Amino acid sequence: DVSDITNVRFYTSIDQGSYIPPHWHRAVEIIYMQEGSLDITVESRSFTIHPGDCTLINANVLHSTKCTNPNKAIVLQIPLDFMEKYIKSLPYGDKI
């Protein structure tokens, strides 16, 4: 679901097997793996997350995902506009 007020996306992803090609967006993305696994490539670094793992993908960073077996994850995407508006002083804000 996407909040009309904040544009923050919070949803459960159930994936039977897919590939999302390299892309980027102006949102911080947090993925918490509940079941299965997910292969993630962030810029040139690839890794796999498993149940109980959580990863944060920064805004404006090229990334892709590949699901090779069924999985279930909780996904939170927080737009930079929201963070800049409601969090006045971000530590390391120039790095986001």
Regions found by a protein language model. Name each.
Residues 35-37, 44, 60-62, 70-71:
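A generic structural motif
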